[in-house]
């Protein structure tokens, strides 16, 4: 199984679990991305819970939406085992074409330091990446404890793969899984197609 994205038994079980989760969600869940989902929760009363999506701390800040959202750890299996998420996000880099490298390096050092992350960066609406900001009492007070409540999920996550070809696979396999969740393909067909895409 060296050229498969996942073994058959594990893959079929994962697809079955996704299907079970989606069957308990409102019908619009397959049309929304996480931001649209948080907008729905923060802006109305038709949905009260999202069990599994990437977090955006601005929805946990007073005044951002009609409803202040509270974030927590990921859902658990019936046996109590926690699910794990991928850790991705935006980064900060310096282009090889940069003509002011030293200034760019100093800016990156400044914006990524703990003090900036827990003050200016957060105050400006940013979602900090520095652990000290996630543990900061004032940052958590002003974000309805978003960071403290989700830190364990971050600690238990796995880093999104960065190898050449992975993003193409992710972009291509997503619609395949989506079709399965809309009952347009069997789990077996879905797994075969995902493995085909993984070999490309």
Task: Label every model-predicted segment.
Residues 2-32, 74:
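Glycine-centered hinge/linker elements that transmit conformational signals in sensory
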Residues 28-42:
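Short helix-initiation/N-cap motifs at beta->coil->alpha
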Residues 62-124, 175-178, 182:
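Extracytoplasmic/periplasmic substrate-recognition and gating elements
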Residues 1-4, 45-47:
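Extracytoplasmic/periplasmic solute-binding protein
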Residues 12-23, 38, 42, 95, ...:
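Non-transmembrane alpha-helical segments in soluble domains
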Residues 24-31, 49-50, 68-70, 118-121:
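Acidic/polar loop patches that form or flank catalytic/metal-binding clefts of enzymes
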Residues 122-172, 179:
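Long, aromatic- and glycine/proline-rich binding clefts that accommodate carbohydrate-like moieties
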Residues 43-53:
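Alpha-to-beta junction loops
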């Amino acid at each position: 199984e060296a050229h498969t994205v996942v073994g058959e038994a594990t893959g079929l079980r994962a697809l079955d679990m996704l299907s079970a989760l989606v069957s308990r969600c409102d019908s619009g869940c397959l049309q929304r991305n996480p931001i649209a989902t948080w907008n729905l929760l923060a802006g109305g009363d038709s949905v009260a819970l999202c069990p599994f999506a990437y977090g955006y701390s601005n929805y946990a800040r007073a005044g951002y939406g009609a409803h202040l959202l509270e974030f927590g750890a990921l859902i658990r299996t019936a046996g109590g085992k926690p699910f794990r998420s991928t850790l991705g996000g935006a980064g900060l880099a310096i282009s090889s074409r940069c003509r002011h490298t030293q200034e760019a390096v100093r800016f990156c050092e400044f914006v990524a330091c703990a003090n900036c992350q827990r003050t200016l960066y957060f105050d400006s609406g940013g979602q900090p990446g520095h652990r000290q900001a996630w543990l900061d009492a004032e940052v958590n007070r002003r974000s309805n404890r978003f960071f403290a409540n989700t830190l364990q999920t971050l600690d238990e996550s796995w880093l999104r793969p960065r190898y050449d070809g992975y993003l193409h696979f992710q972009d291509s396999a997503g619609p395949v899984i989506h079709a399965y969740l809309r009952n347009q393909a069997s789990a077996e067909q879905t797994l075969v197609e995902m493995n085909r895409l993984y070999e490309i």
